[in-house]
């Protein structure tokens, strides 16, 4: 019999299945609407101070959590409605299949020898300057994006959904969207975007570790994944991308990391990232291997998290 906690687990599974089958909605995506709202609010809240960014994030993430809590409260005595609500929220929040299709296009173009088109395509996945990347660098950019996005577009939201339900799903996606919008180190957002970046780091901590663990267990070389994770992840500038990318590099037997350029012209910023893994530079066919590993990790995370979502909720004592 379907009850409230099982409804959450069923909803997560349904939402995951919808994302795998249909990807993101082609039109009227709620996340795009949220981004428009956030950009408009920024016109009022922006100031070159961390405190202004804290207010901006609190208002928008708080609104997402509140909407999710109100919707879940309304469905609390109707398990089927709760399952459908959770499924809709999960489908809205997950982005794994859309990103997988973008990465597949990069791999296909590289395998066909169409480097200029591959550079243009990989720019849809990463924020770095891709105009002069060579074949191995394009493959590396695609694999790093596949690894990181497996965590923050699939596993991390499922973790929050399993633990907190719809409020966790919507709050996570709000925080993640704000990080993408303002959580970077440009002159405008270095201070204002601090709160968005730190909150996104915090919310992604458990999901990134689960992603790295599953990549290690489900990859072709668990020992190499463990070595890369333990040895290389800590030197990465991101506390969450480091473990995930290192584990993927070890599992795939390739080397990630290296020189990365963000922006162009006078505002260009160069990061010399440490190497992750101990194999050769990735080849075009490694993009497809990374995508297959990401698919296994996504499904594995659902298998791990569904029982957590289905755990009985003890009634509060009065």
Where are these regions (language model features)?
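Short amphipathic, positively biased membrane-proximal segments
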Residues: 1-318
């Amino acid at each position: 019999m379907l009850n409230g906690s099982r409804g959450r687990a069923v909803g997560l599974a349904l939402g995951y299945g919808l994302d795998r089958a249909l990807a993101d909605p082609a039109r009227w995506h709620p996340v795009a609407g949220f981004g428009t709202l956030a950009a408009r609010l920024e016109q009022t809240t922006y100031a070159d101070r961390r405190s202004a960014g804290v207010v901006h994030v609190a208002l928008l993430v708080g609104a997402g959590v509140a909407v999710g809590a109100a919707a879940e409260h309304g469905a609390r005595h109707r398990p089927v409605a709760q399952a459908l609500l959770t499924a809709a929220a999960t489908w809205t929040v997950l982005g794994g299949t859309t990103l997988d299709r973008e990465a597949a296009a990069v791999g296909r173009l590289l395998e066909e020898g169409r480097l200029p088109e591959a550079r243009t395509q990989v720019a849809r996945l990463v924020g770095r300057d891709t105009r002069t990347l060579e074949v191995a660098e394009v493959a590396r950019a695609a694999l790093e994006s596949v690894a990181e996005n497996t965590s923050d577009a699939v596993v991390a939201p499922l973790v929050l959904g399993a633990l907190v339900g719809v409020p966790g799903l919507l709050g996570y996606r709000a925080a993640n969207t704000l990080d993408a919008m303002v959580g970077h180190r440009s002159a405008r957002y270095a201070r204002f975007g601090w709160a968005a970046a730190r909150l996104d780091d915090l919310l992604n901590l458990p999901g990134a570790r689960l992603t790295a663990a599953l990549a290690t267990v489900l990859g072709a070389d668990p020992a190499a994944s463990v070595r890369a994770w333990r040895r290389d992840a800590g030197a990465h500038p991101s506390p969450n991308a480091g473990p995930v990318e290192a584990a993927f590099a070890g599992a795939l037997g390739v080397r990630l990391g290296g020189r990365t350029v963000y922006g162009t012209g006078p505002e260009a910023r160069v990061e010399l990232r440490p190497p992750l893994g101990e194999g050769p530079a990735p080849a075009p066919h490694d993009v497809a291997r990374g995508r297959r590993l990401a698919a296994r990790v996504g499904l594995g995370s659902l298998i791990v998290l569904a029982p957590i979502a289905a755990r009985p909720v003890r009634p509060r004592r009065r």
